[in-house]
Amino acid sequence: VRILIGNHIDPSIRERGDMRAWTQRLLWFARPRDLLILCCEPDAAFVDYALAHTGVKRGELTVLAAPAGAWGDRLLDPASLSVPTFVDRVRAALGPAEVGAVTEVFALWPSAAVARFADALGLADRFPGAAFFGQSGGEIGNSKANFRALAAAAGVPILPGRVCHGRAEAIEATSALLEHSVSGAVVVKQAHNGAGVGNQLLVRDAQMAVDHVGARHLHHLAPGPDGIAAYWAERWPWASGEGRWPVVVEDFAPCADAVYSEHYASDADTRATETGRLLYVGRRLSHQVVPLDGVTEPVRAALLDGGARLAEAYRALGYRGHLSADALVLPDGRVVFTEVNAQVSGSLHIYQSIAHGIVNVAAEPARQVVEYHVPPTWAVPSFAAFLAALDELGLAYDPATRTGVIVSMPAIPLAPREPVQFVFCLAYDPAEGHAGTFDRLDARFANVPAGTYDASQHIGTGAVSFSS
Protein backbone atom coordinates (compact mmCIF):
# COMPACT_ATOMS: atom_id res chain seq x y z
CA VAL A 1 0.00 0.00 0.00
CA ARG A 2 1.35 3.42 -0.96
CA ILE A 3 0.04 6.97 -0.72
CA LEU A 4 0.68 8.93 -3.93
CA ILE A 5 0.28 12.71 -3.86
CA GLY A 6 -0.29 14.69 -7.06
CA ASN A 7 1.08 18.02 -5.91
CA HIS A 8 3.35 20.48 -7.68
CA ILE A 9 6.00 23.00 -6.67
CA ASP A 10 4.88 24.87 -3.56
CA PRO A 11 3.19 28.13 -4.63
CA SER A 12 5.22 29.91 -1.96
CA ILE A 13 8.27 29.22 -4.15
CA ARG A 14 6.77 29.75 -7.59
CA GLU A 15 3.20 30.57 -8.52
CA ARG A 16 1.57 28.15 -10.93
CA GLY A 17 -1.68 28.20 -12.85
CA ASP A 18 -4.03 25.37 -13.66
CA MET A 19 -2.17 22.13 -12.89
CA ARG A 20 -5.14 19.76 -12.88
CA ALA A 21 -4.06 17.92 -16.00
CA TRP A 22 -0.32 17.75 -15.42
CA THR A 23 -0.56 16.32 -11.91
CA GLN A 24 -2.85 13.52 -13.10
CA ARG A 25 0.22 11.84 -14.60
CA LEU A 26 0.25 10.37 -11.10
CA LEU A 27 -2.05 7.65 -12.51
CA TRP A 28 0.89 6.13 -14.41
CA PHE A 29 2.63 5.33 -11.11
CA ALA A 30 -0.39 3.70 -9.45
CA ARG A 31 -0.36 0.06 -8.35
CA PRO A 32 -3.14 -2.06 -6.84
CA ARG A 33 -4.17 -0.92 -3.33
CA ASP A 34 -2.57 2.52 -3.70
CA LEU A 35 -4.32 5.64 -2.40
CA LEU A 36 -3.99 8.68 -4.67
CA ILE A 37 -4.48 12.30 -3.60
CA LEU A 38 -5.16 14.91 -6.29
CA CYS A 39 -6.27 18.54 -6.38
CA CYS A 40 -9.56 17.54 -8.01
CA GLU A 41 -11.56 14.54 -9.10
CA PRO A 42 -9.55 12.97 -11.92
CA ASP A 43 -10.74 13.03 -15.51
CA ALA A 44 -12.79 9.83 -15.77
CA ALA A 45 -11.94 9.17 -19.42
CA PHE A 46 -8.23 9.54 -18.75
CA VAL A 47 -8.38 7.30 -15.68
CA ASP A 48 -9.97 4.52 -17.73
CA TYR A 49 -7.50 5.09 -20.57
CA ALA A 50 -4.34 5.09 -18.42
CA LEU A 51 -5.37 2.11 -16.30
CA ALA A 52 -6.24 0.12 -19.42
CA HIS A 53 -2.58 0.49 -20.38
CA THR A 54 -1.09 -0.26 -16.96
CA GLY A 55 -3.43 -3.15 -16.18
CA VAL A 56 -4.51 -1.72 -12.82
CA LYS A 57 -8.26 -1.96 -12.17
CA ARG A 58 -10.12 1.17 -11.08
CA GLY A 59 -11.59 -0.69 -8.12
CA GLU A 60 -8.09 -1.50 -6.88
CA LEU A 61 -7.35 2.19 -6.25
CA THR A 62 -8.64 4.75 -3.79
CA VAL A 63 -8.65 8.28 -5.19
CA LEU A 64 -9.29 11.31 -2.98
CA ALA A 65 -9.51 14.99 -3.87
CA ALA A 66 -7.82 17.22 -1.31
CA PRO A 67 -9.90 20.05 0.16
CA ALA A 68 -10.05 23.05 -2.13
CA GLY A 69 -7.67 25.69 -0.86
CA ALA A 70 -6.48 29.03 -2.18
CA TRP A 71 -6.35 27.75 -5.77
CA GLY A 72 -9.63 25.88 -5.82
CA ASP A 73 -9.41 22.62 -7.74
CA ARG A 74 -6.70 23.91 -10.12
CA LEU A 75 -3.74 23.21 -7.82
CA LEU A 76 -3.30 21.26 -4.62
CA ASP A 77 -2.91 23.74 -1.77
CA PRO A 78 -0.10 22.39 0.46
CA ALA A 79 -2.02 23.50 3.54
CA SER A 80 -4.94 21.28 2.56
CA LEU A 81 -2.95 18.15 3.31
CA SER A 82 -2.79 19.01 7.01
CA VAL A 83 -6.47 19.84 7.48
CA PRO A 84 -7.44 17.49 10.35
CA THR A 85 -10.67 16.37 8.73
CA PHE A 86 -8.78 15.42 5.57
CA VAL A 87 -6.13 13.51 7.53
CA ASP A 88 -8.99 11.65 9.23
CA ARG A 89 -10.55 10.99 5.82
CA VAL A 90 -7.32 9.48 4.53
CA ARG A 91 -6.98 7.36 7.65
CA ALA A 92 -10.57 6.15 7.27
CA ALA A 93 -10.12 5.41 3.56
CA LEU A 94 -7.10 3.25 4.34
CA GLY A 95 -8.64 1.52 7.33
CA PRO A 96 -6.82 0.66 10.57
CA ALA A 97 -4.94 -2.29 9.10
CA GLU A 98 -3.87 -0.50 5.93
CA VAL A 99 -2.41 2.56 7.65
CA GLY A 100 0.21 0.36 9.22
CA ALA A 101 0.73 -1.43 5.91
CA VAL A 102 1.69 1.74 4.02
CA THR A 103 5.17 1.21 2.60
CA GLU A 104 5.76 4.63 1.03
CA VAL A 105 4.45 8.16 0.83
CA PHE A 106 5.29 9.36 -2.70
CA ALA A 107 4.84 12.96 -3.85
CA LEU A 108 5.49 14.64 -7.18
CA TRP A 109 7.01 17.59 -5.30
CA PRO A 110 8.97 17.10 -2.03
CA SER A 111 7.00 19.61 0.00
CA ALA A 112 7.33 20.30 3.71
CA ALA A 113 3.54 19.95 3.72
CA VAL A 114 3.90 16.31 2.66
CA ALA A 115 6.29 15.72 5.56
CA ARG A 116 3.72 17.20 7.96
CA PHE A 117 0.96 15.11 6.37
CA ALA A 118 2.99 11.91 6.73
CA ASP A 119 3.78 12.78 10.34
CA ALA A 120 0.11 13.39 11.10
CA LEU A 121 -0.64 9.86 9.89
CA GLY A 122 2.23 8.41 11.90
CA LEU A 123 4.04 7.62 8.65
CA ALA A 124 6.99 10.02 8.70
CA ASP A 125 9.37 7.08 8.32
CA ARG A 126 7.57 6.04 5.10
CA PHE A 127 8.27 9.38 3.38
CA PRO A 128 11.91 9.12 2.28
CA GLY A 129 13.81 12.26 3.25
CA ALA A 130 11.03 13.49 5.53
CA ALA A 131 13.39 15.24 7.96
CA PHE A 132 15.13 17.13 5.13
CA PHE A 133 11.93 18.01 3.29
CA GLY A 134 10.23 19.03 6.53
CA GLN A 135 12.78 21.85 6.79
CA SER A 136 12.04 23.10 3.23
CA GLY A 137 14.68 20.87 1.68
CA GLY A 138 12.66 20.81 -1.53
CA GLU A 139 13.41 24.49 -2.09
CA ILE A 140 17.09 23.97 -1.31
CA GLY A 141 17.43 21.05 -3.70
CA ASN A 142 15.64 22.68 -6.60
CA SER A 143 17.41 26.04 -6.67
CA LYS A 144 19.53 26.60 -9.78
CA ALA A 145 21.72 28.86 -7.66
CA ASN A 146 22.35 26.14 -5.09
CA PHE A 147 23.02 23.72 -7.94
CA ARG A 148 26.07 25.66 -9.10
CA ALA A 149 27.60 25.54 -5.62
CA LEU A 150 26.88 21.83 -5.21
CA ALA A 151 28.18 20.99 -8.68
CA ALA A 152 31.38 22.91 -7.98
CA ALA A 153 31.84 21.07 -4.69
CA ALA A 154 31.28 17.71 -6.40
CA GLY A 155 33.76 18.51 -9.16
CA VAL A 156 31.10 18.31 -11.85
CA PRO A 157 31.74 20.45 -14.96
CA ILE A 158 29.48 23.47 -15.41
CA LEU A 159 29.53 26.45 -17.76
CA PRO A 160 31.27 29.67 -16.70
CA GLY A 161 28.86 31.78 -14.71
CA ARG A 162 27.97 33.39 -11.43
CA VAL A 163 25.24 33.42 -8.80
CA CYS A 164 24.14 37.04 -8.31
CA HIS A 165 22.34 38.52 -5.31
CA GLY A 166 21.80 42.05 -6.57
CA ARG A 167 21.47 44.13 -9.71
CA ALA A 168 24.99 45.60 -9.53
CA GLU A 169 26.49 42.14 -9.21
CA ALA A 170 24.41 40.94 -12.17
CA ILE A 171 25.62 43.85 -14.32
CA GLU A 172 29.23 43.10 -13.44
CA ALA A 173 28.84 39.35 -14.05
CA THR A 174 27.13 39.88 -17.40
CA SER A 175 29.84 42.28 -18.55
CA ALA A 176 32.64 39.93 -17.50
CA LEU A 177 31.06 36.90 -19.16
CA LEU A 178 30.35 38.73 -22.41
CA GLU A 179 33.91 40.03 -22.53
CA HIS A 180 35.30 36.49 -22.62
CA SER A 181 32.39 34.67 -24.27
CA VAL A 182 33.04 32.99 -27.61
CA SER A 183 29.32 33.06 -28.40
CA GLY A 184 28.81 36.69 -27.36
CA ALA A 185 25.71 35.69 -25.41
CA VAL A 186 24.71 34.75 -21.88
CA VAL A 187 21.73 33.03 -20.28
CA VAL A 188 19.90 34.54 -17.31
CA LYS A 189 18.19 31.93 -15.13
CA GLN A 190 15.58 32.30 -12.44
CA ALA A 191 16.48 30.16 -9.43
CA HIS A 192 13.12 28.40 -9.51
CA ASN A 193 11.50 27.50 -12.81
CA GLY A 194 11.48 24.67 -15.34
CA ALA A 195 11.46 23.63 -19.01
CA GLY A 196 13.31 26.81 -19.99
CA VAL A 197 10.40 29.00 -18.89
CA GLY A 198 12.59 30.91 -16.41
CA ASN A 199 15.52 31.41 -18.78
CA GLN A 200 16.28 34.50 -20.86
CA LEU A 201 18.94 34.54 -23.55
CA LEU A 202 20.85 37.82 -23.91
CA VAL A 203 22.44 38.17 -27.34
CA ARG A 204 24.31 40.89 -29.18
CA ASP A 205 24.01 39.22 -32.59
CA ALA A 206 20.38 39.28 -33.74
CA GLN A 207 21.19 36.63 -36.36
CA MET A 208 22.40 34.04 -33.86
CA ALA A 209 20.63 30.66 -34.17
CA VAL A 210 18.67 30.20 -30.94
CA ASP A 211 15.58 28.27 -32.01
CA HIS A 212 16.88 25.07 -30.37
CA VAL A 213 17.66 26.70 -27.02
CA GLY A 214 15.76 26.07 -23.79
CA ALA A 215 15.11 29.74 -23.06
CA ARG A 216 11.56 31.04 -23.33
CA HIS A 217 12.65 34.67 -23.37
CA LEU A 218 15.05 36.44 -25.75
CA HIS A 219 16.60 39.89 -25.44
CA HIS A 220 18.83 41.70 -27.93
CA LEU A 221 21.29 43.76 -25.91
CA ALA A 222 21.91 47.35 -26.91
CA PRO A 223 25.61 48.10 -27.52
CA GLY A 224 28.03 48.79 -24.70
CA PRO A 225 27.71 48.90 -20.91
CA ASP A 226 24.53 50.97 -21.11
CA GLY A 227 22.73 48.10 -22.84
CA ILE A 228 23.61 45.71 -20.02
CA ALA A 229 22.63 48.21 -17.32
CA ALA A 230 19.34 48.96 -19.06
CA TYR A 231 18.51 45.26 -19.27
CA TRP A 232 19.02 44.66 -15.58
CA ALA A 233 17.16 47.83 -14.59
CA GLU A 234 14.15 46.35 -16.35
CA ARG A 235 14.52 42.61 -15.69
CA TRP A 236 16.05 42.19 -12.23
CA PRO A 237 12.61 42.03 -10.55
CA TRP A 238 11.51 39.29 -12.98
CA ALA A 239 14.76 37.33 -12.73
CA SER A 240 14.93 37.48 -8.92
CA GLY A 241 11.25 36.95 -8.17
CA GLU A 242 10.97 40.52 -6.87
CA GLY A 243 14.22 40.14 -4.97
CA ARG A 244 13.36 36.86 -3.25
CA TRP A 245 15.93 34.63 -4.96
CA PRO A 246 19.47 34.88 -6.34
CA VAL A 247 19.89 34.86 -10.12
CA VAL A 248 22.21 32.74 -12.25
CA VAL A 249 24.08 34.40 -15.13
CA GLU A 250 25.78 31.81 -17.30
CA ASP A 251 27.75 31.66 -20.53
CA PHE A 252 25.70 30.54 -23.53
CA ALA A 253 26.84 27.37 -25.30
CA PRO A 254 25.63 27.44 -28.93
CA CYS A 255 24.94 24.30 -30.96
CA ALA A 256 24.79 22.10 -27.85
CA ASP A 257 22.52 19.08 -27.36
CA ALA A 258 20.35 18.93 -24.23
CA VAL A 259 20.47 15.59 -22.40
CA TYR A 260 19.83 14.30 -18.90
CA SER A 261 20.60 11.43 -16.56
CA GLU A 262 18.08 10.47 -13.89
CA HIS A 263 18.99 8.85 -10.59
CA TYR A 264 17.39 7.62 -7.38
CA ALA A 265 18.84 8.57 -4.01
CA SER A 266 18.10 6.23 -1.10
CA ASP A 267 19.41 6.08 2.46
CA ALA A 268 22.11 3.65 1.34
CA ASP A 269 23.27 4.91 -2.05
CA THR A 270 22.26 6.26 -5.45
CA ARG A 271 21.54 4.44 -8.69
CA ALA A 272 21.08 5.57 -12.27
CA THR A 273 17.57 5.05 -13.64
CA GLU A 274 17.60 6.44 -17.22
CA THR A 275 19.18 8.82 -19.69
CA GLY A 276 17.36 10.86 -22.32
CA ARG A 277 17.41 13.78 -24.70
CA LEU A 278 15.44 17.06 -24.67
CA LEU A 279 14.62 18.91 -27.89
CA TYR A 280 13.43 22.51 -28.15
CA VAL A 281 11.59 24.22 -31.00
CA GLY A 282 11.03 27.96 -30.96
CA ARG A 283 12.86 27.99 -27.58
CA ARG A 284 10.13 25.90 -25.94
CA LEU A 285 10.38 22.26 -24.92
CA SER A 286 9.00 20.31 -27.87
CA HIS A 287 9.77 16.66 -27.15
CA GLN A 288 12.06 14.29 -25.31
CA VAL A 289 13.36 10.84 -26.20
CA VAL A 290 14.26 7.79 -24.07
CA PRO A 291 16.46 5.86 -23.93
CA LEU A 292 19.26 8.19 -24.99
CA ASP A 293 20.89 7.31 -28.30
CA GLY A 294 23.14 9.02 -30.83
CA VAL A 295 25.95 9.79 -28.38
CA THR A 296 29.44 8.38 -28.10
CA GLU A 297 30.40 6.10 -25.24
CA PRO A 298 32.67 8.78 -23.71
CA VAL A 299 29.71 11.20 -23.70
CA ARG A 300 27.43 8.60 -22.12
CA ALA A 301 30.05 7.80 -19.49
CA ALA A 302 30.57 11.49 -18.67
CA LEU A 303 26.81 12.03 -18.40
CA LEU A 304 26.36 9.09 -16.04
CA ASP A 305 29.45 9.92 -13.99
CA GLY A 306 28.52 13.56 -13.51
CA GLY A 307 24.91 12.66 -12.79
CA ALA A 308 25.99 10.09 -10.21
CA ARG A 309 28.29 12.56 -8.46
CA LEU A 310 25.51 15.12 -8.33
CA ALA A 311 23.04 12.54 -7.04
CA GLU A 312 25.48 11.60 -4.29
CA ALA A 313 26.00 15.26 -3.37
CA TYR A 314 22.26 15.78 -3.07
CA ARG A 315 21.90 12.53 -1.12
CA ALA A 316 24.55 13.76 1.31
CA LEU A 317 22.44 16.87 1.91
CA GLY A 318 19.51 14.69 2.91
CA TYR A 319 17.62 14.50 -0.38
CA ARG A 320 15.83 11.22 -1.05
CA GLY A 321 13.94 10.14 -4.15
CA HIS A 322 14.16 10.61 -7.90
CA LEU A 323 16.22 13.43 -9.37
CA SER A 324 17.27 14.53 -12.84
CA ALA A 325 20.66 15.99 -13.76
CA ASP A 326 20.36 18.11 -16.91
CA ALA A 327 23.39 18.60 -19.11
CA LEU A 328 24.62 19.87 -22.46
CA VAL A 329 26.80 17.98 -24.92
CA LEU A 330 29.02 20.63 -26.48
CA PRO A 331 30.14 20.44 -30.12
CA ASP A 332 33.60 19.27 -29.01
CA GLY A 333 32.07 16.34 -27.07
CA ARG A 334 32.45 17.75 -23.57
CA VAL A 335 29.53 17.33 -21.18
CA VAL A 336 28.61 20.22 -18.87
CA PHE A 337 25.78 20.18 -16.35
CA THR A 338 23.19 22.94 -16.10
CA GLU A 339 20.78 22.06 -13.28
CA VAL A 340 19.32 19.34 -11.07
CA ASN A 341 15.59 18.82 -10.73
CA ALA A 342 15.39 17.28 -7.26
CA GLN A 343 11.80 16.13 -7.62
CA VAL A 344 9.72 13.73 -9.69
CA SER A 345 10.56 15.18 -13.08
CA GLY A 346 8.42 15.32 -16.18
CA SER A 347 10.43 12.37 -17.49
CA LEU A 348 9.79 9.72 -14.83
CA HIS A 349 6.40 8.60 -16.12
CA ILE A 350 7.79 8.44 -19.66
CA TYR A 351 10.61 6.03 -18.98
CA GLN A 352 9.53 4.19 -15.83
CA SER A 353 5.85 3.63 -16.54
CA ILE A 354 5.49 3.87 -20.31
CA ALA A 355 8.86 3.07 -21.94
CA HIS A 356 9.84 0.29 -19.52
CA GLY A 357 6.52 -0.68 -17.94
CA ILE A 358 4.30 -0.80 -21.03
CA VAL A 359 6.47 -0.75 -24.16
CA ASN A 360 9.43 -2.66 -22.66
CA VAL A 361 12.01 -0.82 -24.73
CA ALA A 362 14.74 -3.22 -23.61
CA ALA A 363 13.10 -6.18 -25.38
CA GLU A 364 13.70 -7.20 -28.98
CA PRO A 365 13.01 -5.72 -31.43
CA ALA A 366 14.29 -2.47 -29.95
CA ARG A 367 11.92 0.40 -29.29
CA GLN A 368 12.23 4.01 -28.19
CA VAL A 369 9.68 6.41 -26.77
CA VAL A 370 9.33 10.11 -27.53
CA GLU A 371 6.95 12.39 -25.65
CA TYR A 372 5.67 15.42 -27.53
CA HIS A 373 4.08 18.57 -26.21
CA VAL A 374 1.12 19.51 -28.39
CA PRO A 375 2.55 22.24 -30.66
CA PRO A 376 1.04 25.74 -30.59
CA THR A 377 -0.03 25.18 -34.21
CA TRP A 378 -2.40 22.34 -33.29
CA ALA A 379 -6.09 22.75 -32.52
CA VAL A 380 -7.28 19.54 -30.83
CA PRO A 381 -10.92 19.92 -29.76
CA SER A 382 -11.01 17.20 -27.08
CA PHE A 383 -9.45 14.07 -25.63
CA ALA A 384 -12.08 11.95 -27.36
CA ALA A 385 -11.40 13.63 -30.71
CA PHE A 386 -7.68 12.90 -30.42
CA LEU A 387 -8.28 9.25 -29.56
CA ALA A 388 -10.72 8.95 -32.46
CA ALA A 389 -8.11 10.39 -34.82
CA LEU A 390 -5.54 7.89 -33.56
CA ASP A 391 -7.92 5.03 -34.30
CA GLU A 392 -8.80 6.40 -37.72
CA LEU A 393 -5.14 6.86 -38.66
CA GLY A 394 -4.09 3.53 -37.19
CA LEU A 395 -1.71 5.26 -34.78
CA ALA A 396 -3.03 4.12 -31.39
CA TYR A 397 -0.58 2.05 -29.36
CA ASP A 398 -0.52 -1.59 -30.46
CA PRO A 399 0.86 -4.04 -27.85
CA ALA A 400 1.57 -6.58 -30.59
CA THR A 401 4.02 -4.32 -32.42
CA ARG A 402 4.91 -2.22 -29.35
CA THR A 403 4.47 0.93 -31.43
CA GLY A 404 1.97 3.77 -31.51
CA VAL A 405 0.67 6.68 -29.45
CA ILE A 406 -0.14 6.71 -25.74
CA VAL A 407 -1.63 9.95 -24.39
CA SER A 408 0.29 10.82 -21.23
CA MET A 409 -2.14 13.18 -19.47
CA PRO A 410 -5.76 14.28 -19.70
CA ALA A 411 -6.65 16.87 -22.30
CA ILE A 412 -8.41 19.60 -20.35
CA PRO A 413 -9.20 23.01 -21.92
CA LEU A 414 -7.97 25.83 -19.72
CA ALA A 415 -10.55 28.30 -20.99
CA PRO A 416 -13.88 28.05 -22.82
CA ARG A 417 -13.52 27.36 -26.55
CA GLU A 418 -9.74 26.94 -26.21
CA PRO A 419 -8.05 23.90 -27.80
CA VAL A 420 -6.99 21.24 -25.31
CA GLN A 421 -3.34 21.11 -24.29
CA PHE A 422 -1.54 17.91 -23.36
CA VAL A 423 1.44 15.64 -23.98
CA PHE A 424 1.53 12.28 -25.70
CA CYS A 425 4.05 9.48 -26.03
CA LEU A 426 4.93 7.70 -29.23
CA ALA A 427 6.61 4.29 -29.17
CA TYR A 428 8.55 3.60 -32.35
CA ASP A 429 11.19 1.52 -34.09
CA PRO A 430 14.49 3.44 -33.84
CA ALA A 431 15.35 2.36 -37.38
CA GLU A 432 12.23 4.11 -38.67
CA GLY A 433 12.14 7.12 -36.36
CA HIS A 434 9.13 9.04 -35.08
CA ALA A 435 8.91 11.93 -37.54
CA GLY A 436 6.59 10.13 -39.96
CA THR A 437 3.96 9.44 -37.33
CA PHE A 438 4.21 12.95 -35.95
CA ASP A 439 3.83 14.39 -39.46
CA ARG A 440 0.57 12.49 -39.96
CA LEU A 441 -0.82 13.94 -36.74
CA ASP A 442 0.50 17.36 -37.67
CA ALA A 443 -1.35 17.18 -40.99
CA ARG A 444 -4.57 16.43 -39.09
CA PHE A 445 -4.37 19.01 -36.31
CA ALA A 446 -2.12 21.90 -37.44
CA ASN A 447 -5.00 24.30 -38.03
CA VAL A 448 -3.98 27.35 -35.98
CA PRO A 449 -3.32 30.24 -38.39
CA ALA A 450 0.13 31.79 -38.44
CA GLY A 451 0.37 34.98 -36.42
CA THR A 452 -2.31 33.97 -33.92
CA TYR A 453 0.03 32.38 -31.40
CA ASP A 454 3.33 33.18 -29.73
CA ALA A 455 5.91 30.65 -30.92
CA SER A 456 7.96 31.14 -27.76
CA GLN A 457 5.08 29.94 -25.59
CA HIS A 458 5.40 26.52 -24.03
CA ILE A 459 2.27 25.18 -25.71
CA GLY A 460 0.65 28.12 -27.41
CA THR A 461 -1.29 31.12 -26.21
CA GLY A 462 -3.11 31.41 -22.94
CA ALA A 463 -2.22 29.97 -19.55
CA VAL A 464 0.45 27.33 -19.37
CA SER A 465 -0.96 24.15 -17.89
CA PHE A 466 2.18 22.19 -17.28
CA SER A 467 5.95 22.06 -17.21
CA SER A 468 8.52 20.40 -15.03
Segments the model singles out, each with a brief description of its role:
Residues 1-133, 449, 453:
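ATP-binding N-terminal substructure of ATP-dependent carboxylate-amine bond-forming enzymes
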Residues 116-120, 197-203, 350:
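Short acidic, glycine/serine/threonine-rich loops at helix termini
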Residues 121-197:
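A conserved helix-loop-beta module that forms one wall/lid of the active-site cleft
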Residues 181-187, 192, 203-204, 213-279, ...:
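Phosphate-binding site of ATP-dependent enzymes
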Residues 233-254, 285-332, 372-398:
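A long amphipathic alpha-helix within ATP-dependent nucleotide-binding catalytic cores
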Residues 280-284, 340-352:
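Glycine-rich phosphate/pyrophosphate-binding beta-alpha loops
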Residues 336, 348-361:
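A short alpha/beta connector and helix-capping loop motif
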Residues 359-468:
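Peripheral (often C-terminal) accessory segments that flank ATP-dependent C-N-forming ligase machineries
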